Structure formats: structure tokens, C-alpha cells
């Protein structure tokens, strides 16, 4: 039976998961647009591409539910074709083909040319930086590397994304320059591990060099670093953060735990003492650095003593931003060979205890901001307020600054000077300073 052509059909790209998936979808849509395809962001598309996440159980469930939803729409005649790509498809393709056969085709994370061909398009290698961005115009993600070479015992990312592949500095500068010409003011650098950047193609860590090139781009005002790895952290990056005004005094560095015993089992390449030494170095070199981290509760073998050690450490370190998650026992990871011996209710209780501590820390730190002035980027208008961020806050995950829109107009994407007049756990209230 002949398959209908995808030539003039509207294509709806649905993105699930993290910022790396957002970036990948933007690249896909940019390629489709360059091929003359019509990309839509509503449910009217005749062709649906689902970019899935396969990181932990909740993400996998959301991806499977979304696939099943659109397969049913296909059965009901509401869409013509359903294609699936991304991490879930990379990790479980044979199982998905067997269990959800009504999907037209599955693609892995490194099969963009094949996906484009199925959509009636050709992959154009020369289109460096040609993305159809889905973030607000004034900020954009810049993925500097794909994959990961780290051996973390709990993580399935290398199974889905492969080993680390850095992108050449010149390609990244070209892409960032195009973004700036289109109105982007903030670059959010992402990778599975920013600090590994360059080791594969330059034989040394080159994140600092990349940053010094990116700050030269006219129009870029903020450069933000997401997802650094603590072991082997290149401290020359701290010099760049301190010296270059465009590089935000902010870093997202998932630390996962502080028990040396568990860090060893996690294969993180660090210890309690080395972790604290790195944090001390960060705060010494960049005194007003905002540090965001992520922790795991309930890793195999985590005792009450290990947990109490982490609680005390969180109280001691007073991280500016912190997220905490329960351990997910992922097949084909090194930790899957260990007994998942912490009950789910204990994992969840530990997460809640950590987040209760962090909520108080966040409130106390925000209270200290009252009366101080900050440069704020306006992200959007919401009801009777404009919503913005300081350089110490990343979109969607950190503090927001609310500024009354009554008798005030603030263009989205503009910077304004703001004095903080009220503060809560995760929100700041400010007024514009002339």
C-alpha cells in the first residue's frame, strides 16, 4: 500500500524532557523549515513527531502516554502519521516497535538525517545555527556537546546519547552570532557535562576558551552555565566568570550526594572533602556566585547516617538553588546491579526533608536581598505584573522578580534596574529604579 506523501502536510513537533531535547527539536524544526516544510505548534498537524525522554520512570511514563495518545488520534483519523524520536526511542526501540506498532517509525537520538528523510526532507549540514527557537526571543539554549563519557553508576544518559562529542568553537560562535542577530541576549550553555568540553577535539578542556570567544559577540549580554561536573572541574572557568561581565555569576553543578561512601559507589570521582574544597574555591574566586545543585535521595545503600550527613551539609552550604529527587533504579546501569534497598516512602520522605530545609534557606537568602538593587531581564507580562530574572536566576527553575505593571510598561527582553522591596521563598517583589 502506498504511503501518503509528507510533502505539503503540517508537521507538529512535540518535545518532552530536558533543555537538550528542546534544542534538538529546534534543530529539527529549523531543518524542516529550510526544506520548505510547514511546522506548527498546535494539534492541527497532520504529521506528529514526538521527541521523547527516557531518563527516569516518570519521564518514561509521560513519553509512553504521549505516544499512546497520538497513536489513538491516528486510529481516530485526527492525524495521519506518528513518528517517535529521542531518548526513549534510542533506549527501547525494539520494545516500542513490539508494544506500540502503530507508530509509523522510531528513530534514535543520532538519526536526524533518517528522520528528516522520512519527513520528506534532506539534512543540510551547512545549516549551522539555523534553528526554529521555541524559547522567548531574548534567550536561547546553546548545546556545546552531545553525549557523556562519565561513568556515573546511576545514569542512563550514555546509553541514550552516546559518548561526549564536542562541537567546534567556530560552529558555536557562528550559531550564537546568528541568535544574537535575531534578538537573543542570553545564551544558556548546555551539555551533559560542560566541563568536559573540548577534550575530544582539542585534547584539553576548552570551556574557558569558548566563553572568551562568546563574550565577544555583539548583542549577547548574559551567558549562563548549566550542568557542570565536579570531578576535574577546570578552575580557569572561574577566572572567566570573575573577569567577564557577560558571564553570569551562576553555575548549575549537580553534586548528587555528599557521603564519600555513596559518591564512590556512584562513580562520581570525588569525595566529601574534595566537593567542599571545590565549593570553597568557587565562592572565593567569585564571592557572589549563585550555585544551583541537584541531589539524589535513596541511592542503594544510603543509610540514615548517610542521609543525616547530607542534611547537615545542605544546612551548612546554604545553596542558592537546589533540587532533590528520589533515586530511580535504571536497567543497564552499573547501579542496577545493586539492591534497590531504600523503600520508596523513605526516599520520598528524605526528599521532602531536604526540600523543607532548602525552602527555609531560600527564604532567608531572599530576605537578604530586600533593599538591594539588581539588573533584571524582563521575561514576560503575567496578569498585573511583569516577570523578570536577575543574572543569578535561570528561566523556569529559579527565582522570579515580580514588578507591578500598573502605570508601568517594560518591554519583554529589556533590562531594567530594580530594587527588591519584598521577598518570599522563590519570588522577589521589586520596583523599577530610574
Give each language-model segment a name.
Residues 172, 189, 225, 253, ...:
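Conserved, mostly hydrophobic/aromatic
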Residues 54-59, 184-209, 213, 217, ...:
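Conserved glycine-rich "GG(E/T)P / GGGxP" loop and the immediately following alpha-helix
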Residues 181, 208-209, 216-223, 234-295:
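Radical SAM/AdoMet-radical enzyme domain recognition
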Residues 18, 198-219, 265-266, 327-360:
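Radical SAM enzyme [4Fe-4S]-AdoMet core and its adjacent flexible, acidic
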Residues 1-197, 236, 247, 251, ...:
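Proteins enriched for Cys/Gly/acidic motifs involved in redox and nucleic-acid/cofactor modification
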Residues 202-215, 235-249, 302-319, 344-349, ...:
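Short, electropositive alpha-helical surface patch
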Residues 16, 151, 155-162, 222-231, ...:
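Conserved strand-turn element in the central/C-terminal portion of the radical SAM core barrel
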Residues 337-434:
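Terminal RNA-binding accessory module
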Amino acid at each position: 500500500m502506498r504511503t501518503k506523501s509528507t510533502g505539503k502536510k503540517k508537521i507538529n513537533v512535540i518535545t518532552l524532557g530536558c533543555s537538550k531535547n528542546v534544542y534538538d527539536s529546534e534543530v529539527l524544526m529549523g531543518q524542516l523549515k529550510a526544506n520548505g516544510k510547514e511546522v506548527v505548534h498546535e494539534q492541527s498537524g497532520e504529521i506528529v513527531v514526538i521527541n521523547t525522554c527516557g531518563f527516569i520512570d516518570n519521564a518514561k511514563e509521560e513519553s509512553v502516554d504521549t505516544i499512546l495518545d497520538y497513536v489513538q488520534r491516528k486510529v481516530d483519523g485526527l492525524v495521519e502519521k506518528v513518528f517517535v524520536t529521542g531518548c526513549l526511542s534510542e533506549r527501547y526501540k525494539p520494545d516500542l516497535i513490539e508494544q506500540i506498532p502503530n507508530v509509523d517509525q522510531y528513530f534514535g537520538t543520532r538519526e536526524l538525517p533518517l528522520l528528516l528523510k522520512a519527513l520528506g526532507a534532506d539534512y543540510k549540514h551547512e545549516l549551522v545555527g539555523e534553528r526554529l527557537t521555541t524559547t522567548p526571543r531574548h534567550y536561547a539554549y546553546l548545546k556545546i556537546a552531545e553525549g557523556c563519557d562519565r561513568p556515573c553508576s546511576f545514569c542512563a544518559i550514555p546509553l541514550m546519547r552516546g559518548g561526549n562529542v564536542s562541537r567546534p568553537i567556530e560552529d558555536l560562535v557562528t550559531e550564537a552570532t546568528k541568535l544574537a542577530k535575531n534578538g537573543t541576549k542570553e545564551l544558556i550553555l548546555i551539555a551533559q557535562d560542560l566541563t568536559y568540553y573540548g577534550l575530544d577535539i582539542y585534547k584539553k578542556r576548552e570551556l574557558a576558551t569558548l566563553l572568551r570567544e562568546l563574550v565577544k559577540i555583539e548583542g549577547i549580554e548574559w551567558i549562563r552555565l548549566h550542568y557542570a561536573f565536579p570531578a576535574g572541574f577546570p578552575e580557569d572557568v572561574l577566572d572567566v566568570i570573575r573577569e567577564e561581565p557577560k558571564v553570569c555569576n551562576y553555575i548549575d553543578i549537580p553534586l548528587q550526594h555528599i557521603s564519600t561512601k555513596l559518591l564512590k559507589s556512584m562513580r562520581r570521582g570525588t569525595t566529601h572533602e574534595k566537593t567542599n574544597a571545590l565549593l570553597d574555591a568557587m565562592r572565593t574566586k567569585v564571592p557572589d556566585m549563585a550555585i544551583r545543585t541537584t541531589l539524589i535521595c535513596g541511592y542503594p545503600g544510603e543509610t540514615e547516617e548517610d542521609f543525616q550527613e547530607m542534611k547537615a551539609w545542605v544546612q551548612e552550604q546554604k545553596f542558592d538553588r537546589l533540587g532533590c529527587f528520589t533515586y530511580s533504579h535504571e536497567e543497564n546501569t552499573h547501579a542496577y546491579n545493586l539492591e534497590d534497598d531504600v523503600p520508596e516512602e523513605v526516599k520520598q520522605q528524605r526528599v521532602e526533608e531536604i526540600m523543607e530545609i532548602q525552602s527555609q534557606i531560600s527564604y532567608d537568602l531572599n530576605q537578604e536581598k530586600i533593599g538591594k538593587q539588581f539588573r533584571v531581564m524582563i521575561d514576560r507580562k503575567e496578569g498585573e505584573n511583569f516577570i523578570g530574572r536577575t543574572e543569578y536566576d535561570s528561566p523556569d527553575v529559579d527565582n522570579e522578580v515580580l514588578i507591578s505593571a500598573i502605570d508601568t510598561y517594560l518591554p519583554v527582553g529589556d533590562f531594567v534596574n530594580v530594587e527588591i522591596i519584598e521577598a518570599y521563598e522563590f519570588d522577589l517583589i521589586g520596583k523599577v529604579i530610574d
